Amino acid sequence: MAEQRTRRPHGPMGGPGRGMMPGEKPKDFKNSIEKLVRYLGRYWYAIVAVMIFAAVSTVFSVAGPKVMARATNALVEGLGKKIAGTGSIDFTYIAKVLLFTLGLYICSAVFSFIQGMIMTGITQKTCYRMRKEISEKINRMPMKYFESRTYGEVLSRITNDVDTLGQSLNQSVTQIITSVATLVGTLVMMISISGIMTLISLVILPVSAILISFIIKHSQKYFRQQQEYLGHINGQVEEVYGGHLVVQAYNKQESTIKKFEDTNQILFQSAWKSQFLSGLMQPIMQFVGNLGYVGVAISGGLLAIRGTIGVGEIQAFIQYVRNFTQPIQQIAQVANMLQSMAAASERVFEFLDEEEEELTVEHAVHLDHVDGYVDFSHVSFGYNPDQIIIRDFSAHVTPGQKIAIVGPTGAGKTTMVKLLMRFYDVTGGAIQVDGHDIRDFNRQELRDAFGMVLQDTWLFKGSIMENIRYGRLDATDEEVIEAAKAAHAHHFIQTLPGGYQMELNEDASNVSQGQKQLLTIARAILADNPILILDEATSSVDTRTEVRIQKALDNLMRGRTSFIIAHRLSTIRNADLILVMKDGDIIEQGTHEQLLAQKGFYADLYNSQFEENA
């Protein structure tokens, strides 16, 4: 099994990586929305149903005040007749009108509930499908994609972006329909009551638009600055938290606090101005709206005196004026939601459209058993075409041999492992396993032949038994325990509370680094892969633990072709072949004794480490 790291910094400061910022805009709004619409194509019938139910719900809701006007008129007329002594209030008629109005609002609520339930289902199915496709996509992505991005950036596609898309989709679709329907329906009702009063009330719209655009124009730059410096604040906090010991050791507390205070002051100023300006919007809108109500009340009163309209119509009209501004504000909010939704969908589809590595090949080689022959034939490789780091690398490895790859940092040691497991393909030459070019294998079958133990171990939240069994999921408890014994891990496991059933926490911090490595070695022993890769597996533990790990590794490597990458040359003195790499080339090869006798680069490297240890 290929081991991974326990924890890797997710963002540039070691934080959770970059998610969606509030109000972030897409690079291509139209294309992003078109892709999302096509993606939602399988739910078109449900979306049409949502549109119908939302529109009908709005129609019932908008009709309510106009119907209520009849009850108000009947009440006013009845009071007039009662005062004049010519009649009384017709409560039967008023009750019928009220019951009919109640029925309208109940129908509106029922249709609204149904469309909300359908839309929520569409949204959650879309989010589920997206997360599933992203999860499957991750397993088909080439290694170069993940090495050029932080974990947090990839994870934010599954969490932040999909959540943002889901929330925006759920709200925006229904709000667009209801807002437009409410706007049109309210306008029709207002005109049906009084064209003059409608014109008077509409005068407030351009005034409101001018004031709102003025506020938005001046507050937007402060909102941008607020978001920018909020990011700086988060970055500084993460940076100081992650490097707390270094800050303390170098007595940099004062400079760190000063830097934070400067950034915090800028954030305070921008946040104060942005919140103040945005806070002005509501009272200004209320003031302008109240002016509209005054105009409607005066004109309505004059029309009522002339007998053109009744008091009920004036009351209904005022309610429509109040309702008329709400959909306009909602449409403005929807515009922002659409921007966020488009930006989130753009990032998700950008990931889903990334180039995948080929997992299968035509006429693939299938081997029932891998012996462990490995041949490197004039291999050359570069991460970029103009940056070749391995040049003309050749070596022949027979089954059961221990091959050590040594050299300074950047020599290309780890790159050789990535090529061997086809995380990357060679630029030139070929790598063969049992006489077959590894490019002729399906990637999964090829990687099944390899086991890997890294210095930075990967253990997941779960029991120790489950973590070891990850090497071979169908293994019995007895086989897991035997693997732990072979890895010299059985003794320390028994001393832990719960033994093999002890739960490791999320970071596996409730066991030591050496114990983590022994557990991953046990996992590799259980997997029983014919070829092993040991990458700096003992470079971060004490000498006593290193001896125990080395014994476990000896058991693991017995009878298997093993590639050992280590900076500590004392750990690979018994290797059958040592390949000395420098600047991507093999400059020396041989056994430990042969290389020391040559008194070349390896001898200098070994002696320098010996002197350091001394």
Segments from the language model and where they lie:
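ABC-type nucleotide-binding domain
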Residues: 360-361, 367-614
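Hydrophobic alpha-helical transmembrane segments of ABC transporter permease domains
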Residues: 41, 99, 111, 115, ...
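Juxtamembrane loop-to-helix connectors within ABC transporter transmembrane domains
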Residues: 18, 22, 32, 40, ...
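Helix-loop-helix
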Residues: 189-203, 273-346, 351-352
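An intracellular "coupling" helix at the cytosolic face of ABC transporter transmembrane type-1 domains
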Residues: 143-144, 162-169, 173, 181, ...
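Transmembrane helix-loop-helix hairpins at lipid-water interfaces of multipass membrane proteins
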Residues: 29, 47-111, 192-196, 307-311
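Transmembrane helices of ABC transporter permease
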Residues: 42, 46-59, 70, 171-225, ...
